[in-house]
């Protein structure tokens, strides 16, 4: 049953994005969707958290997460599309840097996103998406430095897109709108969902590993020192 829901979620999310990409540009509508789409994540996160806390069971968490993920991806994807259009329509707010700076950062951060996905696939036996949620808790490699290496890399990638477009408005949108919305999702919803699915192992991992900003992993206390 969840496979069918995932299929419908992919079709719905992709359909919304394609529809927005094919709409004639309208600055006012784009601004509303760029801000409203990102902040629309907040009530969805609140509702998802309430559903998790009402019955903190693994199977329920999987179902709730499926719907929350597709809602979040649809809203954030729509907001990114519209924020890009707003940024490109404001040439007077250009960043005084060559676009190659943004392109180089896009390549590096994009590669890190792929590495984080591979890390999660190999160590967590899954993906960070509802279509194949991880079955094990990934705690090493990139995930030993930060609990969310993929999210961090993706946010840097978005800033890099703004630098590549030389759009001050887009970079400001990422910093002031997108990042806060993503952080609320991670802190309010995802941490609780992972705690339900992985229990004490996740709580211990959360205590020693930062949520976003990387930190060198602590060496095991019983490690032999020569």
Predicted segments with their positions:
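Histidine-centered phosphotransfer motif of kinases
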Residues: 140, 145-152
């Amino acid at each position: 049953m969840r496979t069918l829901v995932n299929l419908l979620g992919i079709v719905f999310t992709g359909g919304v994005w394609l529809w927005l990409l094919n709409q004639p540009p309208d600055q006012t509508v784009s601004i509303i969707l760029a801000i409203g789409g990102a902040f629309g994540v907040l009530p969805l996160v609140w509702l998802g958290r309430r559903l998790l806390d009402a019955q903190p069971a693994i199977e329920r968490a999987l179902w709730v997460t499926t719907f929350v993920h597709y809602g979040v991806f649809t809203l954030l994807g729509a907001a990114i599309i519209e924020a890009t259009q707003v940024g490109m329509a404001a040439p007077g707010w250009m960043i005084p840097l060559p676009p190659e700076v943004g392109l180089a950062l896009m390549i590096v951060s994009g590669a890190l996103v792929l590495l984080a996905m591979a890390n999660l696939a190999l160590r967590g036996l899954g993906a960070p998406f509802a279509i194949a949620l991880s079955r094990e808790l990934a705690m090493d490699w990139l995930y030993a430095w930060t609990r969310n290496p993929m999210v961090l890399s993706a946010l840097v990638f978005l800033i890099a897109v703004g630098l590549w477009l030389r759009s001050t408005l887009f970079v400001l949108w990422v910093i002031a709108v997108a990042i806060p919305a993503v952080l609320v999702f991670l802190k309010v919803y995802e941490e609780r969902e992972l705690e339900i699915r992985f229990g004490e192992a996740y709580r211990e991992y959360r205590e020693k590993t930062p949520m976003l900003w990387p930190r060198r992993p602590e060496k095991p206390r019983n490690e032999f020192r020569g």
